[in-house]
Amino acid sequence: MAKIPLILSFCLLEAFLGAESTVFIENKEASTVLSRTRRGNSNRLEELIPGNLERECIEEKCSFEEAREVFENTEKTMEFWKIYIDGDQCNSNPCKNGAVCKDGVSSYECMCPPGYGGRNCEIDSTCATKNGGCEHFCRHDTPQKAVCSCASGYKLHEDGKSCKPAVPYPCGRITAPEMRGKVTRTENTIERWNITAHDEGDAHDEALDITEPPPPPTTSAAPAKIVPITKNDTRVVGGYDSVKGQLPWQVHLVDSRGLGFCGGSIINEKWVVTAAHCLEPGDNVTAVAGEYNTKEDDHTEQRRQVVKILPYPTYNRTRNKHHNDIALLELDQPLTFNSYVTPICIGSRDFTNNLLSNGPGTVSGWGSMLYRGRSAIVLQVLTVPFVDRVTCLKSTSTTILHSMFCAGYTAGGKDTCGGDSGGPYTNSIGETWFLTGVTSWGEECAKPGKYGIYTKVAKYVKWIRETTRLT
């Protein structure tokens, strides 16, 4: 009986092995059914095999030394390590103006193109854009480096860009207590500046016997606009009563009878600039600085006798009294500067040209408030837009030379007029005012379609500086 269970067991085993469905299959066939990723260091000692990037730094966190084993080159390892350790700092594109970004460990470096600087190459280090960031003057020390400087009476701030007063009453700065809290400047937003390599000498004289045809319309981009911020004072015909001390560089020229006939601007303690057609050598002229109300004693006036009248060397009244219409007046005694008697700033040639052509200007004087009307008693002030040369030439049959420019309103109603000649046309940058023009002539006053014509000061900068010994 004991043999029966044993025989039965063998029979069952044979039946199981002969079944159609088998449990075990060949190794190669099994690999197609079940697979797993083998580690880079499977079954071998890591120290005995060459470096593997997957094994060292992807499956596990690696050290710099382990990464170095993979690349076997320090420079390539560094490039990998900068991104591996803290991500690519250049992904956010921090570099500006076409600069190339180079990633670093927790940092980045911008490789700036020529003419740009700063951490992100955001600073245009040339004078072409935004005047090189300079508050006053910009010049090129090297072809791609802008160097800032300041007008007389100012010093360059530690930032190398802004200008701070170095004297109590620097040029072009309004300091009268009556002007505190009053906005008188235009917000300068000039983007592009045209600075030449040699921003110095005066322009060449023009031939008077050549009639200049209007140039063809230009297709270049229009100059950047400056949005003016002006005061809302009581309106006078064409202008406004100024605030006392608002125009401390304004001079009133009076004759031997004490009657005013022209204006002028203070250059320094001994010199005033005006229009050449206003007077002739030998005239008895008194320059009154600090004037405000011509019918009252303002207690701020300083009267000086004019001892020398110097028109521009090539000025010829007989041929054309408005060509090179600018003159310098030497005073018998120096003026004493204060909040009501302050010089106007004189910029370089290119600086003055850029400032002039990119925004509205401010004109002032005691001239007629209507064509052939009575003169103003209180000093008048008016903001007028600069007029492009094509429009200027089309407005008149009279020759407009390059020493002249137009300013005013096409609709008329606002303009300089008789008695304002010789007075200042000024533009501001920041809180500093610069002389950019001298009131010269016009066809009637404030007539629609006509503009005031001014002498372009930029042409005469070198002559003014040399004659007045202005530093």
UniProtKB/Swiss-Prot annotation:
Binding site for Ca(2+) 8: 291, 293, 296, 301
Annotated residues for binding of Mg(2+) 3: 75, 79
Record-listed Ca(2+) 7 binding positions: 86-87, 89, 103
Residues given in the record as Ca(2+) 1 binding sites: 46, 56, 60
List of residues binding Ca(2+) 3: 47, 56, 66, 69
Binding site for Ca(2+) 5: 65, 69
Coarse class of the protein's main subcellular location: secreted
Record-listed Phosphoserine modification sites: 107
GO molecular function: calcium ion binding; endopeptidase activity; serine-type endopeptidase activity
Domain called Gla: residue spans: 40-85
Cysteines joined through disulfide linkages: 57-62, 90-101, 95-110, 112-121, 127-138, 134-148, 150-163, 171-345, 262-278, 392-406, 417-445
Annotated binding of Ca(2+) 4, by residue: 54, 59
Coiled-coil blocks: none
Sugar-bearing residue positions: 92
Entry's localization field: Secreted
Residues annotated for Ca(2+) 2 binding in this entry: 41, 46-47, 56, 66
Domain of life of the source: Eukaryota
GO cellular component: extracellular space
Enzyme Commission number: 3.4.21.22
Domain (EGF-like) ranges: 86-122, 123-164
Catalytic residues, chain numbering: 277 (charge relay system), 325 (charge relay system), 421 (charge relay system)
Family indicated by similarity: Belongs to the peptidase S1 family.
Protein name per its UniProtKB record: Coagulation factor IX
Source organism: Gallus gallus
Gene name, Swiss-Prot/TrEMBL: F9
